[in-house]
């Protein structure tokens, strides 16, 4: 554990004491995630990318002032994804705020081989069709067979890749040029993969994977 991080929350203390060893365990506690360092520790391979930068000017008594609004996506490319927005008078602080917020919004998604055209049983696509919306933007994500790739818009490609989705078809409607709403719609669609309840009595034709399948052990000392 880094000396630079002193846990301040119950969840942080459980991680620091070794009682929680994976991000999956942390999220399942339902305890609020208020320390981004928890994500850094349990997902040391997490990546981040800026997907939108907006600058706005407003008049004040002292003249024109510039405000940055920046959107960042984080993920481990293996079942975990987060999205955050940060605002500040300068770009660097806005990026840092967005990065922290993205980590605090980290979530576990489900993957599988939900395409009837494939049936390989691997965690390369969505397990079933999901939909998400934000503002006027609505997006539908459908499972695709291996080799199709990500047949979606550029922003959606980044988010899906960060989440560990390799193949998918997507259909969007609304003001999709509004990047923030488009990104949030994709994020909300992925959130639906974890919300759908699966009857344990039903025999699935293909496995559904929650979270990481490449490295499920989290941080190792």
From Swiss-Prot:
Q: Domain S5 DRBM: where?
A: 46-109
Report the record's disulfide bonds.
Answer: none
- Which terms does the UniProt entry file under GO BP? translation
Q: Which GO terms describe its molecular function?
A: rRNA binding; structural constituent of ribosome
UniProt keywords (A-Z) are:
Ribonucleoprotein, Ribosomal protein, RNA-binding, rRNA-binding
Q: Which InterPro entries match?
A: Ribosomal_Su5_D2-typ_SF, Ribosomal_uS5, Ribosomal_uS5_arc, Ribosomal_uS5_C, Ribosomal_uS5_euk/arc, Ribosomal_uS5_N, Ribosomal_uS5_N_CS, Ribsml_uS5_D2-typ_fold_subgr
Q: Which domain of life is it from?
A: Archaea
Cellular component, GO, one term: cytosolic small ribosomal subunit
Q: How does it assemble?
A: Part of the 30S ribosomal subunit. Contacts protein S4.
| Family indicated by similarity | Belongs to the universal ribosomal protein uS5 family.
Report the domain remarks.
Answer: The N-terminal domain interacts with the head of the 30S subunit; the C-terminal domain interacts with the body and contacts protein S4. The interaction surface between S4 and S5 is involved in control of translational fidelity.
Q: What does this protein do?
A: With S4 and S12 plays an important role in translational accuracy.
UniProt-recorded name of the protein: Small ribosomal subunit protein uS5
Gene coding for it: rps5
């Amino acid at each position: 554990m880094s000396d630079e991080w002193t846990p301040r929350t119950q969840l942080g203390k459980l991680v620091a004491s070794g009682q929680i060893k994976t991000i999956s365990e942390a999220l399942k506690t339902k305890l609020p995630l208020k320390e981004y360092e928890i994500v850094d520790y349990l997902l040391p391979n997490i990546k981040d990318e800026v997907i939108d930068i907006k600058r706005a000017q407003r008049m004040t008594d002292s003249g024109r002032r510039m405000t940055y609004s920046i959107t960042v996506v984080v993920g481990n490319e293996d079942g975990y994804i987060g999205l955050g927005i940060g605002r500040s008078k300068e770009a660097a602080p806005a990026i840092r705020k967005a990065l922290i917020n993205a980590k605090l919004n980290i979530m576990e998604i489900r993957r599988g081989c939900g395409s009837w055209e494939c049936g390989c049983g691997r965690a390369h696509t969505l397990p079933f069709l999901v939909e998400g919306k934000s503002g006027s933007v609505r997006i539908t994500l459908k499972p695709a067979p291996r080799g199709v790739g990500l047949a979606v818009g550029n922003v959606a490609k980044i988010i899906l890749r960060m989440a560990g989705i390799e193949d998918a078809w997507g259909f969007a409607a609304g003001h999709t040029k509004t990047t923030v709403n488009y990104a949030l719609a994709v994020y909300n669609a992925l959130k639906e993969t974890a919300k759908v309840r699966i009857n344990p009595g039903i025999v699935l034709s293909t496995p559904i994977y929650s979270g990481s399948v490449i490295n499920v052990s989290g941080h190792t000392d």
